[in-house]
Amino acid sequence: MNKEERAKRQSKIRNFSIIAHIDHGKSTLADRILEKTNALTQREMKAQLLDSMDLERERGITIKLNAVQLNYKAKDGEEYILHLIDTPGHVDFTYEVSRSLAACEGAILVVDAAQGIEAQTLANVYLALDNNLEILPVINKIDLPSADPERVRQEVEDVIGLDASEAVLASAKAGIGIEEILEQIVEKVPAPTGDSEEPLQCMIFDSLYDPYRGVIAYIRVVNGTVKVGDKVRMMATGKEFEVTEVGVFTPKTTQRDELTVGDVGFLAASIKNVGDTRVGDTITHAKRPAAEPLAGYRKLNPMVFCGLYPIDSARYNDLRDALEKLELNDSALEFEPETSQALGFGFRCGFLGLLHMEIIQERIEREFKIDLITTAPSVIYKVFLTNGEDMIVDNPSNMPDPQIIDRVEEPFVKAAIMVPNDYVGAVMEICQGKRGTFIDMQYLDETRVTLTYEIPLSEIVYDFFDQLKSNTKGYASFDYELIGYKPSKLVKMDILLNSEQVDALSFIVHRDSAYDRGKVIVEKLKELIPRQQFEVPIQATIGNKVVARSTIKAMRKNVLAKCYGGDISRKRKLLDKQKEGKKRMKSVGSVEVPQEAFMAVLKMDDN
């Protein structure tokens, strides 16, 4: 293509994404748009087409990003090229949403006509506004009996401050309003700005590992043109590669000769390691590099940590392979080997949040058929010592001795919880139980309230979301952002079995709730650990102080069975001999902790 052709093509490109809260009908709308633009034959169409992982279909959530190029003949008779970039809606994947929004010029905001605006909708709208996107509100599911589009339209104007007078009323399921949405995209979303003659700048917004072609980077070209055979450089890592293929997704991968300004597609360059294509990095030409990378990218830091151990310790290497393969597609996952006396060899893994952690665990169990034990999730603590040094602790067993600790700081989050009026009391109670500090309360309309709390991340990691959902009958929605570290009275609690510490059961807890947690765990273990030949004390300790104790009684043989009547001194002798033996056993005996005891303690809730 020459310069004029490229410029004409560029004026016809529209890049947009769809943002919505979970379950407001985003993936269905994407399906309808694909149908309307004839991207697929009827035979190839299936529900949630862009959600390619089984797990995504099953949970009905979008985890990885997907991008599609669609051709649309608008009412003005012109052919337009639309790029739809699908985004995940869950709070753990906020960074992935921000990347895919940065690759667009416009966003369709889908709001459920019955439920109205939810917490995550707001969070994503703010991300879109930060990226200066043109936002087109769409009120979806208007065919529901409980739909109230006018109220929702008012809510969009009041809560977000968008003009919703031209909001499209649609039903993705019934296919109503799809054409209006496409027309609005063509009219209102600006064409990409950029110059095809400038040095190349492409933004990576996702990457995928293909066993035959290496890493395939999903890219949006901002300036310049990239062709097969070009030598390109990744600006963050400085690695250089030769491009082997470029192309676009028409959901299927379709090869092209070149990608130019405004194109959204893929690039393969026999890259072996996904760490070389960081999400959010800028690709440029090695010979004629861009002056600076595109703004807005950062390396993701995991927030939540836990240990993953294979139940069958022989499968340690399989687990490593599984984690390495998942890491190829998931730049936010981190792991390092770790050993535990109780659980053997395993890995300490870092995740973006709880959903991310659950998904990784589930994918390992599903795709790689490895049964896992997971230790309790923990966050990163900052520990300041009395000698003026400070250290970072992400694993309770690395916590130093309480005598030398000056103070401990933990990460806090600002949580915005949207909830119907009737449940405000229940939500406040949960937040206070989780050491939350009340900040603010705002009424969205007559029926719904937003509560803002500051809560320690470690409390949210534990079963906050489950409690919130079960106490509000599933109506509450919740979004959080980190606000930094604050000092807290935190202590490390160890569990001793027969005076020996079980490292996998150590955890960090707030001093006020230490006694209760210790007591519950000790009782739980007493039920689950089988009786031994000698008595086994179970103790919960903080430093050298025992806060809770329980004893598993010994099993004993009746040594007096042979003595019918007879002298007391004879019985005494046999009993003393037995006692002596038990004592000796106790000093050398070790106690096996069964698998289910670990599981039970780790799954235990605060109740």
Swiss-Prot record:
Signal peptide: none annotated. Its EC number is 3.6.5.n1. One of its GO terms (cellular component) is plasma membrane. It is an enzyme of class 3 (hydrolase). Its main location: membrane. It is found in: Cell membrane. The keyword Glycosyltransferase does not apply. The keyword Cytoplasm does not apply. InterPro entries: EF-4, EFG_III/V, EFG_V-like, EFTu-like_2, G_TR_CS, LepA_C_sf, LepA_CTD, LepA_IV. GTP binds at residues 23-28, 140-143. Pfam families: EFG_C (PF00679), GTP_EFTU (PF00009), GTP_EFTU_D2 (PF03144), LepA_C (PF06421). GO terms for biological process: positive regulation of translation. Keywords: Cell membrane, GTP-binding, Hydrolase, Membrane, Nucleotide-binding, Protein biosynthesis. It is a peripheral membrane protein. It catalyses: GTP + H2O = GDP + phosphate + H(+). One of its GO terms (molecular function) is translation elongation factor activity. Residues 11-193 form the tr-type G domain. Required for accurate and efficient protein synthesis under certain stress conditions. May act as a fidelity factor of the translation reaction, by catalyzing a one-codon backward translocation of tRNAs on improperly translocated ribosomes. Back-translocation proceeds from a post-translocation (POST) complex to a pre-translocation (PRE) complex, thus giving elongation factor G a second chance to translocate the tRNAs correctly. Binds to ribosomes in a GTP-dependent manner. Belongs to the TRAFAC class translation factor GTPase superfamily. Classic translation factor GTPase family. LepA subfamily. This is Elongation factor 4. The gene is lepA.
